[in-house]
Regions:
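Conserved class I S-adenosyl-L-methionine
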Residues: 1-37, 50-54, 77, 96-99
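Conserved Class I S-adenosyl-L-methionine
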Residues: 3, 48-50, 184-276
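Class I SAM-dependent methyltransferase SAM/SAH-binding core
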Residues: 40-102
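A short SAM/SAH-binding and catalytic strip from SAM-dependent methyltransferases
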Residues: 112-126, 148
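Conserved catalytic/acceptor-binding region of the Class I
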Residues: 126, 131, 141-216, 234
Length: 276
């Protein structure tokens, strides 16, 4: 299943995780970008708007946020949220980030670029993100969030151990997958130093990286919502309902057996300034 297909299938589950995971990181990213009234913001891999909606509130009625993603079902949730919040300065657009161009309404380039938990899903992280950075005006701000090294690791190991009981050779390419683990792009940006170096190589200066500590209680409801509402869901795409239910039950049992009481969702929040 494609990345867009995986996330389209998770729209309601994805958003159920927002208050505990995507939301805190998105709010932190919008704050770290020091957005100002009237700014034009490009939010990439926007999902249901975890970082785009706080950005829209920050830039006010004279600003604009273009929130793009390949998963239109997720974007529709964001549109509903924006309408409910009376935010008229945000457009949720189903579009490919690798092809997005600055519209005529933003003639001087974006004032800020944000991407929360999305850079490792880009088809070529280095080339694709460098291109997006060039859509920002010189002196504009660039910000990303990524999992910190070790985050979600114990959770993911337990999940894939259970999945392997039913499909030892299942392929899954999410950022916490074991397939091609050492070559996954996230390996190059999961520490403060490596993330800062990477942003500098992408055309940013004055890079700052902060750690957002987030440990979510591993309740039965949350752990399964997190599986279904994230890239982990892709590993379940070939299983029927009865097998999925068995995996859910055994996964919960294994978390208890291993003493995993919290899900470590610690995140790195990085910002920089686009160089001339």
């Amino acid at each position: 299943m494609s990345v867009a297909g995986t996330f389209n299938s998770t729209s309601s589950d994805f958003d159920s995780v927002t208050p505990l995971v995507w939301g805190p990181a998105g709010q932190s990213l919008a704050f770290a970008l020091a957005l100002r009234a009237g700014d034009a913001v490009l939010d990439v891999c926007a999902g249901t708007g975890a970082s785009a909606l706080p950005a829209a509130r920050a830039v006010g009625p004279d600003g604009i946020v273009h929130a793009i993603d390949l998963a239109d079902d997720l974007l529709e949730v964001g549109r509903v949220k924006a309408t409910a919040a009376a935010l008229r300065n945000i457009d949720f657009v189903c579009a490919d980030a690798t092809e997005w161009e600055t519209p005529s309404s933003v003639p001087d380039g974006y004032d800020a670029l944000s991407c929360s938990y999305g850079i490792f899903f880009l088809p070529d992280m280095d080339i694709s993100f460098a291109r997006l950075v060039r859509l920002v005006r010189p002196g504009g701000r660039v910000g990303v969030t990524v999992w910190r090294k070790g985050a979600v690791e114990a959770f993911g190991n337990a999940f894939f151990d259970v999945v392997a009981r039913y499909a030892p050779d299942v392929a899954h390419n999410g950022p916490r997958s074991r397939s091609n683990y050492d070559t996954n792009p996230i390996r190059r940006v999961e520490t403060a130093d490596s993330l800062a170096e990477w942003l500098q190589s992408e055309g940013c200066s004055d890079v700052q990286v902060q750690e957002l500590s987030n440990h979510v209680p591993a309740t039965e409801e949350f752990v399964w919502n997190f599986v279904l509402g994230s890239g982990f869901r892709g590993a379940l795409s070939n299983f029927d309902e009865s097998t999925t239910l068995a995996i859910r039950r055994e996964f919960g049992e294994l978390l208890t057996e291993r003493g995993i009481d919290f899900v470590d969702a610690t995140t790195l929040v990085a910002t920089g300034v686009r160089t001339a």
